[in-house]
Amino acid sequence: RRQRQMCIRDSSRGALNIPGYRPAGIYSAGTAQRLVNMEGFMPGREVVILGSGDIGLIMARRMTLEGAKVKVVSELMPYSGGLKRNIVQCLDDYGIPLKLSHTVVDIKGKERLEGVTLAEVDQKGKPIPGTEEFYSCDTLLLSVGLIPENEISGGMGVEMNPVTSGPKVNESLETNIEGVFACGNVLHVHDLVDFVSEEAASAGKNAAAYVREGDRLENEKEIVLNPVEGVRYTVPGTICVNRMDEKLTVRFRVGGVFKNCYVSAYFDEERVIHRKRQVVAPGEMEQIQLTKEMLLKYPDLKTITVKIEEA
């Protein structure tokens, strides 16, 4: 029996529309990671990294340990896309500067990369004239986001979430197509492999139960999860109380950096969860725990709204 595996891939330079020629020396951070770690090949000696995702941050440290000079990490957004601990351990500990609200506006070199020009950007992401700064380098690494590979899922008719580029799933991690389950980075991009393992175990258990028993609760009422006010999405997107386990983890990401705030969940109009956080950021996945006992107290519940509230 043939099997197909889906995963995630790096965004490419073509998706960024960076002006300039296409010289050698421009790699995705994932490609550079494979070259260094598995092939024993050094892509270059003077490095600029565009994007501050976790792979890019880790490669900044890795290239430094291999003897390269990482001159700067540039991030388009006003915040880093990686974990705080990776910023500290991979950049701060090695004296590598991180320029927020900056991007590459020009590439110099025809055959081989000779340097890149960075510029500060405004709130709309447009370069600000007069802020250009040139960095000589022979290597540019792109850490500008990961894309779940869902071509097979889409071809099957699986409904996709435009925010995550992954399938929409219910509490069992089942898609809109009966018997098709999704988990891991093909569902939404994770920062910790622990969460991937938990999702995989849950999806596998639910898929096995479906094979044994079928979808016995096909017409059961579902509760819709509604992400608003700083929350970009939730996984899962719907919940059937009678089908869920005793505990359910709802994972989500925020759309900006929020300090001294609360993560709140409203059951229709009633606030049930109100958890204090010192800081939440897009680079770190958040989660709340729901229990079947909690949901059974609200038999007419239609919507669970997840939001970020100011202290």
What are the functions of these language-model segments?
Residues 194, 202, 206-275:
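Mid-to-C-terminal Rossmann-like scaffold of FAD/NAD(P)H-dependent oxidoreductases
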Residues 9-19, 147-156:
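Flavin (primarily FAD) binding-site architecture
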Residues 27-36, 138-190:
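FAD-site-proximal beta/loop scaffold in flavoenzymes
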Residues 42-99, 106, 188, 195-209:
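Rossmann-like dinucleotide-binding core of oxidoreductases
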Residues 3-8:
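Short, small-residue-biased leader/transition segments that mark boundaries at the very start
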Residues 10-48, 52-57, 163-171:
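Glycine-rich dinucleotide-binding loop and its adjacent helix/turn
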